[in-house]
Structure formats: C-alpha cells, structure tokens
C-alpha cells in the first residue's frame, strides 16, 4: 500500500528541517565555539560601555516586554522580569495542557533549579549567547538579539489593524519557541514575527540600548543597597504589620 503523497511530503519536510538545524548547529560550533551553559552562572564585571541593567535595560523590558513575559505561563516560559529569567531561557512545554493527565514538574525561578546548566537539563534553551564571549557571538548566537532585530527590519504598522492571517493571538495557539539553530529558517519563514509580537517595534533608542547590552554580554548589575533611613522605615512597618497585640492584628 502506497503512502499518501501529503504524508511523504510531510516526512521529507521534517527530515529537511532537522538536517538544516543540525547543519546550523555545527556551523555555530565551528565559528563561535561550543555552548557553555554555565557562562552566566559565573558573572563577570560589566564592561564600561555596557548599558546598566537596573537603570537602562530593565525599564525597557518592564515597559515593552513583561506584559506578556512575566508569568510562569508566559510564551515559551520566558520570564523577562528578572535577569536570571533571561539567562534561564525558553521552554516550549505548555504550562496549562488540558490533555495532560499527570502533574508536571514546576519550573519556578529560585526553587526548582539553581543554575542555568540545571535549567538546560529541565528542557530550557538559551536566548542569550553561551558561546564565545565576543560582540559578534553575542549578536549572532542570541535568539533575543535576533528576534528584536527582526522586528526592526519588519516593524509592521504603528496603528490600525494588523495584516490579516499573519498573527495568531488565540490563547491555545501552538507555541513557536525557536532555538538559535533554527533562527535562520524562522527569519525567512516568519519575517513579521519579531518582538514585540504583533505590537509596534521598539524605538530606535530602546533597541540601541538593548542591542548594546546584549553585545556586551548581557551583564547583570545588582540593585543598590537601601539607605539606612529607608531600612529603618521598613523596620517600623514590619513591626506594625507583624505585631502580636489585638490592635496590631486589627490593623
């Protein structure tokens, strides 16, 4: 019995796609070195030219990205509210799967894995470069950089309705969580799917800040310590809200 033609075409497409991904991975390994999942577990001092994460990068992410990428069920489980959420990366597994009969292992930041290497073992793939620490590699091997650049090349309309048939905003839509090896094909097949998805592109200034930050290795800078006056004020509120008296409990 001969297989249906459409089934043969589907099998060939899967084989070709898989071969292309392998070829792209080998090329990346040859040109930029093999990935090191522990790269961001060993934070280095940020270069002087890198935009500061707390004061320049995080405000852009909060303003333009976290409306979608904040919760644990964010698209591709990519949490952009925290630096360790960015370095953890993406995972195509759906959090709320209606057909799942058994419970799934949770993926809570700070609880269920404590290194990026451990997150890789749980199925997460990087969206930042984990290969050679050079500006070129930080651009070419970063899903985040390339998907932001894709939006800059194909910004779409700033207002009015979007082109019909190009975007799917349904809650149960299939997730497309492309690894870096698949980005060349993704960029060709879905030129309109840059980030922010279905929304106006980042401004030139915003994109420049994020691009320079990624090129510099996406360094993290901790929050500055609280002042003594603010710590004292917080202690007063903690004492008030956690008091044992009936009056304190009523408050």
What are these regions (language model features)?
Residues 1-6:
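Positively charged n-region of N-terminal signal peptides that target proteins for export
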Residues 8-18:
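Bacterial N-terminal signal peptides
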Residues 19-251:
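Aromatic- and Gly/Pro-enriched helix-to-coil junctions and flexible linker segments
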């Amino acid at each position: 019995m001969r297989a249906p033609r459409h089934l043969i075409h589907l099998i060939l497409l899967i084989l070709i796609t898989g071969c292309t991904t392998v070829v792209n991975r080998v090329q990346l390994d040859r040109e930029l070195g093999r990935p090191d999942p522990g790269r961001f577990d060993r934070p280095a001092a940020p270069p002087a030219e890198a935009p500061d994460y707390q004061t320049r990068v995080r405000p852009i992410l909060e303003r333009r990205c976290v409306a979608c990428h904040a919760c644990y069920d964010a698209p591709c489980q990519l949490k952009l509210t925290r630096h360790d959420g960015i370095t953890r990366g993406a995972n195509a597994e759906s959090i709320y799967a209606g057909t799942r009969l058994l419970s799934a292992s949770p993926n809570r930041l700070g609880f269920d894995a404590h290194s990026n290497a451990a997150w890789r073992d749980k199925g997460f793939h990087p969206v930042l470069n984990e290969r050679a620490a050079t500006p070129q590699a930080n651009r070419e091997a970063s899903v985040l950089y390339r998907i932001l650049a894709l939006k800059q090349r194909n910004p779409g309309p700033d207002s009015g309705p979007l082109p019909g048939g190009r975007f799917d905003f349904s809650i149960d839509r299939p997730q497309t969580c492309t690894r870096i090896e698949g980005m060349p094909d993704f960029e060709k097949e879905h030129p309109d799917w840059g980030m922010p998805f279905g929304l106006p592109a980042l401004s030139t200034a915003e994109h420049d800040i994020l691009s320079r930050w990624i090129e510099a290795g996406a360094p993290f800078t901790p929050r500055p310590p609280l002042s003594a006056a603010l710590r004292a004020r917080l202690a007063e509120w903690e004492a008030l809200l956690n008091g044992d008296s009936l009056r304190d409990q009523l408050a």
